[in-house]
């Protein structure tokens, strides 16, 4: 009995000693685990053949041991100690590997695997490190706007539930922001939850912005340590509205200042290039030193030509920052004299003037009965064809809608004028009698036979054009007759007669009246003939001059030749006389 008790005593003593003293030479082993994962700790001791059982313990901060798991090598049974924080979380395998589910920060301890034989205790320590990835950093408490040249809190970067704690870095357009006195102020804080032991990191950024920061993205990141090493997580980008003062004022004129005409409404719009743009301005009208306070627009209604001038606007609190625009209110006046309906007598003179007054050169177009005229009408002696509806129209091409027009309806009146002609048909069986009538209003024509007073109704009339038309009858008189043509309008009654011989008696035919159109053709032909004659005369004159010059030159040459021949004759005679004398 005594011999059996001795080994048991030695075993208990060894367990007590090993609970406080780690056997040297086994070294340290670290297991890294992510928060919430299962911690797996192999027992790094070779299992001896005479193993009795294995145990796991951990050490408190004061070094005292806490046993948590036991496994017998003979009974193949597992027992877990009543440790509240590890209840239902432990699993000890046959090879004495200890697994702890749902890893927590409090699991960061030194665990020891103990394999016990009758003679010895073998131990292997394992250090557990638990890591918790922080939440994605977020920029919160963001400033609604930043102001240039003012140090202002931009926002806070926050990342939660980290273990161990991490570092926060700020970036502007992807580049790290370093603290700079008076321009970049970064304050970092961290806080640990007493229950979860997880850290929350917060970094606030105060920043003095410039206009270069417009549309620039700001981000932050958290750098932390995980089971596999160091990692970095970035926040979403944040872009801030940058407020900056107005540096320039501009003025706009609506509609376009090149197309303003009398009667238009003008809207002046003043703009500042600051952010936010100014909401109020002072507007200065031509000749008014005091500005009118208004929003960024000021409207003038039904403007007149005297509104032409320089318009200005400025900031309310900085009147020296001013902008101006020159505005011309275009106008167009037209005066037609005479105008309306005018009645004149044929042969009268009628001066017509269309006077234009405009803000710039205007185009003038004359129309007669909707047909464009080549030049302004001028009437020194009115004709019936001058009657019609005349329109003087003017416009400013650069200003849409600015045009004026006045009309003149000219009526040319005249008493009836009659001319009668007769012509025998080539067959000799009939005669054509024509009564040409001129006058306005249109005269009525009546044919009668003098003596009998009979009225001839079978007539043929031409169209009434330019105050003229004719009435024609065809007769075959067996005896001499006198025909009377009567033309009558509101002005007068005119009568003319023509003697017509019997069809059997030959007589001289009278030429037909030449129409206005034929007159123009005759005039054109006459002009052409005159031009040809003048051209021929000029050609003959030039030819005569050339011939005269030629003849004059020829006579001069003949004189020189005759003179030379005379001199030769005289010299010959002198030589002959000299020979005779010598003989």
From Swiss-Prot:
Disulfide bonds join 43-113, 157-220, 270-313, 354-392, 435-485. The keyword Cell membrane applies. Residues 28-527 are extracellular. Glycans are attached at residues 91, 95, 167, 265, 306, 361, 457, 480, 499. Residues 1-27 form the signal peptide. Residues 28-120, 125-234 form the Ig-like V-type domain. Residues 562-583 are annotated as: Disordered. Residues 569-583 have a biased composition (Basic and acidic residues). Gene3D superfamilies: Immunoglobulins. InterPro entries: CD80_C2-set, Ig-like_dom, Ig-like_dom_sf, Ig-like_fold, Ig_sub, Ig_sub2, Surface_Rcpt/Adhesion_Mol. GO terms for biological process: adaptive immune response; axon extension involved in axon guidance; cell adhesion; heterophilic cell-cell adhesion via plasma membrane cell adhesion molecules; neuron projection extension; retinal ganglion cell axon guidance. Residues 550-583 are cytoplasmic. The chain crosses the membrane at residues 528-549. Constitutively expressed in the autonomic nervous system. Sympathetic and parasympathetic nerve fibers but not myelinated nerve fibers in the spinal nerve. It is a single-pass type I membrane protein. Glycosylated. PROSITE patterns: IG_LIKE (PS50835). Keywords: Adaptive immunity, Cell adhesion, Cell membrane, Cell projection, Disulfide bond, Glycoprotein, Immunity, Immunoglobulin domain, Membrane, Repeat, Signal, Transmembrane, Transmembrane helix. GO terms for cellular component: axon; dendrite; immunological synapse; plasma membrane. CDD domains: Ig. Homodimer. Interacts (via extracellular domain) with CD6 (via extracellular domain). Homodimerization and interaction with CD6 involve the same region and cannot occur simultaneously. The affinity for CD6 is much higher than the affinity for self-association. Interacts (via glycosylated extracellular domain) with LGALS1 and LGALS3. Interaction with LGALS1 or LGALS3 inhibits interaction with CD6. The CD6 binding site is located in the N-terminal Ig-like domain. This is CD166 antigen. It comes from Bos taurus.
